[in-house]
UniProtKB/Swiss-Prot annotation:
Residues 512-582 are annotated as: Disordered. It comes from Solanum lycopersicum (Tomato). Gene3D superfamilies: 1.10.287.1490. It comes from the Eukaryota. Expressed in seedlings, leaves, flowers, and fruits. Keywords: Coiled coil. This is Filament-like plant protein.
Amino acid sequence: KEDLVKQHAKVAEEAIAGWEKAENEVAVLKQQLDAAVQQNLTLEVRVSHLDGALKECVRQLRQARDEQEKMIQDAMAEKNEMESEKTALEKQLLKLQTQVEAGKAEMPTSTDPDILVRLKYLEKENAALKIELVSCSEVLEIRTIERDLSTQAAETASKQQLESIKKLTKLEVECRKLQAMARKSSPFNDQRSSAVSSFYVDSVTDSQSDSGERLNTVDNDALKMSKLETREYEPSCSNSWASALIAELDQFKNEKAMPKTLAACSIEIDMMDDFLEMEQLAALSETANKTPSVTSDAVPHDSPNIENPLAAEYNSISQRVVELEQKLEKIEAEKAELENAFNESQDALKVSSLQLKETQTRLEGLQKELDVVNESKELLEFQLYGMEVEARTMSVNIDSLKTEVEKEKSLSSEMEAKCHELENDLRKKSQEAEAQQTSGSNSELKIKQEDLAVAADKLAECQKTIASLGKQLQSLATLEDFLTDTANLPGGGAVVAKAGGELWKLHVNETFTPKRDSDPTKVEENVSHSTNENEGESPASSSSSSTSSTTQASTGKSKNGFGKLFSRSKSGVPTLKVIEDK
């Protein structure tokens, strides 16, 4: 029975320890589950934030791409507009060039050497203007370099203008001198012809040759003057155009000076032509005056024949002079028209050059904007690539975390299953322990009741024997015989334990005396009944412990001579005392 009690106590302690361990493991697993769930929630929140950030980045990238495409389309549209404007300006230039060429073709051609000279001069001017038109496009590109030379060009142009003005004044003075000499020579020749007619008859050929040489010299001088004027005009024009292309102020000044110089040159040329014609007419009149006097003195019969060709020649010369004047007027009108057209073409060229500059600046700005947009596009693409890489890494991390969460879920499910199994095992063990305790307590109660009944019977028998022995002792004489007789009895004396744990022996006269001469061996065993913290202990075990603690009785066995005593100590824990009776 003691072994069974010990085994039951050990089983109960082991079951309680296993229950506590299982509860601790379950608590740890629950904590791990809570931590895993919290980690999973944080990861899900982080994944949602990352998904939102990725969506926002993709949206921003799409917006940036749309804006870049719009900017590129706008730039292409502006570029197309600039190209269309450029083509329109080129068409206008071609039209102006065709108009200039048509004006050249419409100019009347004549066999007159003066007109041919004028035409050549105008052709040279047109060629120079064409060259200048071609050089304008080149000068526009080299304008930055020529800005540094603008001051020097202006100074040289002013010096050349001063020199040309000086030369013109010198030529005018020489022309006036020649006119005065011509006027003086005409009346002097008249007087000589009237005074010495015979001398003129002899020297007709000489005077004609002299007049022809003089006319030739005058013609040569006029040609030289025209050449000098053209040479002076050409550098002045070129310098004026260069200065016009270099600086706007010089351009306006030279444009104002250009018509003046052209008008001055045309006036000087007209004056020289008029002077030459007057010289020729004077020479013809002198010859006409000389020839009649000579013929009247020398050959009077041929005078009407000589006067008729002279008059015809005079009329033809006068008609030719009129025609030349008309042609000059026409040429001057055409020249004015050409100058107007040239000025208009210059204005159109200036406008077109300004428009070209504006288009170039716009194109440069658009190119810069395109470069900036391309750079921003590359940066955004790089950022998108980085975000995609981060998204991939985050997706990989999320997948790994999901796998870990699944593993933890599986582990938690396994641990829950183990916990349930342990709980079931603990319940089964607790039920078995309770059943064993109830069965053991019932058997012990039965045994105790039987022992109590036997003890009561024995006590009754002892009382009977004591009564009989008292009767016999009364008959006996001495106390020693009575003691020996009582010692030899089978029951001996009942041993009772008081509350303090001291043993007392019951004598015949029912007085308690401490048993000193007996030497018992005491065996004490503490049986602690532990209670369950969560669910409590079973009612069977509590009832058995209460019954075992409340029942304090002394039983004695006749067979082995042992007595069991139940007493309660100060701590309230029931203790079992076994006393051996000799």
